[in-house]
Structures are given as structure tokens and as C-alpha cells.
Amino acid sequence: MQSLWTDLRFAARELRKRPGFTLTAVLSLALGIGATSAVFSVIYAVLIDPFPYPGADRIVELRLVDKSGSDRHYVGLSGSQADLLRQAKSVEDVTLMDWWNLTTTDGDLPEDVKANYISPNAPNHWGMRALMGRWLIPSDAPPGESPQPVVVLTYQFWQRYYRGDPHIIGRTIQLVHKPYQIVGVMPPRFRWGDVDIYVPLKVTQDPNIEVSPSVKIKPGVTKEQAAAELQPIIEEFAKQRRERYPESFKVKLPSIVDVYARPLGPTLYLLLGAVASLLLIGSANVSILLLARGTERRHELAVRAAIGAGRWRMIRQLLTESLGIATTGVVLGVLLAWRGLGLMVANLPENSIPAEAVIKMNVPVLLFSVALAFVTTVAFGLWPALQLSRPEVARLMQSSTRRVSGSVRARRSHGAMVAAQVALTLLMLTAAGAAGKGFLRLVKADLGYDPHSTMSVPIPVHENTHVEWKDRAQYFEQIRARIAAMPQVVAAGISTNATPPASGWRQPIEILGSTTVEKPEARLEFVDDGYFGVLHIPLAQGRLWDHTEIMRGTPLAVINQTMARQLWPNGDGIGHQIKMAALKDQPPYTRTAAGSDSWMQIIGIVADSRTDGLRKAVMSAVYVPFTVNMWMFTQILVRTHVAPLALLHDVRAQIVQVDPEQQVMQVRDLNEWITSLDEYGQQRLVAMLFGIFSVLALALAAVGLYSVVSYGVATRTNEFGIRMALGAKVGDVLQLVFSATAMNVGGGVLAGVLLSVAFDKLATRWVTESSRDPVLLLGVTVLLVVTAALACFVPARRAASVDPMEALRCD
């Protein structure tokens, strides 16, 4: 123990004696450890521990896969259907849910509250207890009866609205002028649905009232086995309401982990590979620095060996110094990771991670960082220690100077490390360039509509208000008209479900006179005539509806060019008739105009627009008047002369003029909405972080190259002096230095190009542009070669300025 303490003190003294060496080594490690720890923090939160619910991988969504392979068809269940599903041998539980926005009416200012109406078997389904009070219980929603007016708060809403009042249980909260008793507060990580409150759901046996199910399969049952058992049950449900189900569907049961956590996994693993490369470059730097530093200490080590120090004793001393560097590096790295986490989280795509996931520097992440430090200590410290612990005692003791020449083996080892650094750096630069090009292409993509200066204002209708079809149609139109009349508003239109970048309701359609058995599918969009003007979607052929046709719910349709080309060879669909079977009147939730289930004549064709993401192929689309099928919700699209959200207060004021109690849900700037999409956000995240990591890698590689060349110059000083004494010129010495470096850099570039080709095959999911682009590879290679030349210039000049007489005296 005493000898270990002595080693630690000696190591600290040695590191303090060389602050430049110590700082460079520590920073090289800290950057790699910090970046790796930050990425691992996100991986741990999103992929390892995304949900606090026991058996989260057994909680599944009920989806249907259509003939095209799309699984974006969701199944709604009535109470009786849920009961049938619970009887399946593979099913442990089924919880029914619905989402709605309410308004608090017990304070000075109303506040929008996101509510999750949930069946009272939720405690068993999610397997979590309330933090305070209780969860919902069966008596809160007796079958066939109206639910009790009770509410359970999320931890976040309790903190925000009630400031964490510990005496909240038993108090009441007014929601849309109805008192609800607060019976519980959930733990901080219980955030299912990302809502504010949980209210008991009224479950009825009415087959027309369907809500979203969450299915929990039994332990030991695979998702495939459960899906196979549920397939005939869901097929029976489909016979009752064929219009709600795609043809020839297959049941799919993705877990909530599959749906909400794992999609980001490949991107995170790609970034982990990038930071691992950065760590390898940093570790190679430290190995180079330790070898160079050790070469200066060969005389000291020879003296130690001569007076009896064993090899293991010297290895332990050298590893202790490496451990000191690693310890300091991990402390600084954790601090860098802590600060860098904010940057990563801020640039994660919106809704790309579960609300329950907590990204922070927790104990597992700290243990990972410590383990990483230990591994890197062995990785970068052991090999130099083994090399330096075998000094040539006789030769070194006979030398009259402490300056020694480096061995050919040491120079080759350094060269191999430099080549590896160059290869990894070129790979990262190429990946960063490809990711950057892909992101720029995405930014400049032609969407077919103009999202700039436009916002979406969601308007929900409270239960038992505007129930009649005519009243609801006039109410929505009145709000739109008041907003459109504002001085700073260019235009306003209504979009029930057609707001890009993700819009439409995928439905099979019938074509009058068609003899084909298979029905084509199209996106059904409910809009008014102003919708196209707001989004700058041009009319290509025919006409749009007039105001009277809109307010009457006249069954007339407008289609996009893709649908016209696919269904009619000459692209002219004007005058043809189509039918949508899914339009059913279900008061008070859905109000449908008379005749909406009849044949609809096509009166116009509009240009294509990407209203389902940014990269997917444009799908057939059918636009019908919003009054044909109205929900308890609509959106007003508003194009403005100024920044859209700057008018939000004035827009709310106009809405209040129509109905003082009308709430407004989350208002979105369409352009910002696009930038929050997963495909946009992931591409931006990869491009940004690869750019940062590649710059750091380039800097570390330059430091490593500088260190190697400096080491080579120091160990070959005598050789250079002799050459110059024999007549060599400055250019000859520079050529010697640069030629040796060129061999290492050239080998690294060749290896880097091969790695880039391999990377191109593996990373097509995240990097849409090819990393084999000759222009990109040439540009990256030139950048790397120029950086290498600059890193070599100073030590090369030092070699060329060696005084021959001084060098000869040292020999």
C-alpha cells in the first residue's frame, strides 16, 4: 500500500512537471469520454430504461397491416369488443382510452388541460401506484353508468398548477365548469399519453362508440403468437364495420417500446460509433504522447533497472501515471457530457423519445464513464508501459547524454497509430459531409405547399356544445371569418385533418363504373376552399367549391394530380364520381352532412403536395368540404404578413369574441412543425453531431500527427545534424520529414476511403447522400492532407534548423 501511495505521488509530480503534455493528454481523453458518455446517457434513457412500467415490452398497440405493408391502421374498440379481446388466452388485460382537451374554469385565467379518459382497470394494466392518494378504481366508472367526477393529476401538472401542494388530495378542480375531486397524484415518470390529468372513461356497449385500446399480453407469450390468436377476432369485428378496416389486413402488435423508443435506436448507435471513433483517436493520441514522453525518460528508466527495479515495478509506475491522466480525463469528460447533454436533448426530434424517458447523468452512466476510463487506461497505457519497461540498460548507461534516438520499431508503431487516426478522421469527415449534404437536400425539398408565415390554430369543441350539424358548421366558419378579417392576416382556411406535414385519413374508395374488384386507397382530407390559397397549392384543372357548396356540405370532390394520373390514363378525372364508405353520422362526436355517403362528383384537380412527411411518395388524395364530415375538432390555417405566432394573442381575442369559453389547443407554426418531424430532426441531429465530432477528430488527429513528427524530429536530431554536416540542405531535411509523414498519412487515407465505402453500405438509413461521392471524398482528403501538412510544418522547420555542431556534440 505504501509503494502504491509512493507511485501516486510520483505520478502526480511527473504530470505537474509537464503541464503541456498533461493538458493535451487529458483533453484528448476528456473529449472522447465526454462525447461517449453523453451519447450513452441518451441510449440508456431511450433504449435501456424508456418506461417505468413493469412489463413494458408486453404492453402493445393494436394495428393492422394492409396489402402495401403499411401498419398505420389503428383499431378502435367498443366496450363489448374489448370484453371479447380480454377473453383471448394470450391477453392479460385491455385498457380503453380517449384523449381530449379541457379547460380549467376555477382560476382567474383559464388553462388548457390535456386529459386522458381511461378505463378504471388502468392500475393493473400499467402496474404503478399513485405517489399520493390513489389511482382510478372500478367504482369510478361503473359499467353502463356515468363516471364519477374524479381526477388523477400527473406529477408535472401538480407541480405547475398547484405548486406541489401536499394537501391537494380531496380538493376540487373546475374543468369546463364541472367540479372534479382530486383523488391522486402520479409519480414523476408516469406520463402515459403525455397528458396533464387522468379521468375515468365511460365504457359503453354501443358498437358505434369506439376508443383506443392498449393491450397487455401475458408473460411468455410472443407478440406474433398473440397476433395470430387475435387475427380471427379482429376479422369478426371488421365484418361489422368493413369501411373502418383495410382489405386483407394482418394484425400486428408492436410494443410501446418498439413504437416510441426503438425508432431512434439506429441513429443513437450510429452516433455511439462516431464517438467511439473519437475516443479511439484520443486514446491513440495519449499513447503517442506517453511513448514520446517515455523516450525522454529512457535514461531514467535504465537507471531504475540498473539499481534493481523489476519490470513489473516499472510497468506499475507507468500505468499509475496513465491512471492519473485517465482519472482527470473522466472527471473533465463527465463535466463535458453533463454540459453536452443539453445540446443533444435540445436537438432531438420532437416526440422522438417517450415522455417517461429521463435523460440525465445518473449512476449507470457514471459507472459507464468510470469503466470507460479503466478500459482506456489499459488501452492507451499498457502498450507504452510494456515498450518502455525494457530499456537497453548498457547502451543507455554508456551514453553521455540523456537524448536518445528512437528505435525503428517505435517509429513504425507511431506511424501505425497516425494512419489509424487519419483513417478514422477521414471516415468521420466523409460521414459528416454526406449527412450535411443530405440535410441540405431535405431543407430544400419541394413540398408542393408553402409552410412559411403560416400557423395552425386547433379548435376543440366541448362535449354537449354545437351538437347539431348546421350549428357546428356555422360555428367553425364564424371563427375562420373573424380571423381572416384581421389586418395582419393574408388568408385563413379550415382544415379538419389536412394540415401538413402529416395529414389525411387513408381510406379505400369506390369509382363509379369501375369493374376492378380491388379498391384503390386515397387520403381523405376535409377542408374548405380557402385551404388551398393559404398553403399556395395551385388549382391545375377544373374548379373549387364556392362558399354555398361548402356550407351545404355538397358532395363534391377535388383530387390531386397523382390520383388523376393513377386512375385515369389521360389524367383527367373531372366529372367522374367516387364514393367514400367511411362517412357515418355519429352524434355528438361526428356530424355528417346529408348525402355524404352518396356518389361525389370530381370538380377539380390540384397540384400534388407532400402532406405525409418529407420524403414519402405523394399518395392519391381526395379533398371534400369540411362540412361533409365534422368532428368535435377543427383547425384554422392562418397565413400572416408577420411572424405567425406574434399574432396568437390577437387570434385568441377574435375567437373569444365568438365564444368566451372556447379554448385553443397547441398552436403550431407550420415551418417549425416541419423541423420537428422525426425524419428532419434525426437528419439534423446526425449532421450536426457528426460535424462537431469530425472537427474534434480532425483537431485530435492534427495533435497526434504533430506529436509524432515532433517525437521523430527529437529522436533523429543527431541524424539530421550529421546529414547537414555532410552537405544536406534544408530542403533535403524537410523532404525526409514530410516523406515519412506522407507514408503514414497516405496509408491512413487509403484505409479511410475503404472504411467510407463500407460505411456507405451500412448507413443508408441515416445518411441519404452517398459517402462514395468522388467530389466529397476528394474534398475531405484535401482537407485532411492540408491539416496534416500544417501539423507537420513546425516540427519539420525545427528539424531543418538543427545546428550540426550541436547535434554532433550530443552524439
Segment roles from a protein language model:
Residues I48-N101, I209-S214, L442, D446-Q507:
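Membrane-proximal extracellular/periplasmic loop immediately following the first transmembrane helix
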Residues M1-T22, I256-A261, L290-R316, T320, ...:
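Alpha-helical transmembrane segments of integral membrane proteins
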Residues L31-L64, L291, G340-E350, L424-S453, ...:
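Alpha-helical transmembrane segments
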Residues G282-A326, V404, V703-A742, V802-D803, ...:
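Interfacial "coupling" helices/loops that link adjacent transmembrane helices in transporter permeases
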Residues R18-V46, P50, I281-A284, A326-V331, ...:
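Short, strongly hydrophobic transmembrane alpha-helices
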Residues M1-T24, Y53-P54, S68, L109, ...:
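Membrane-helix entry/capping segments
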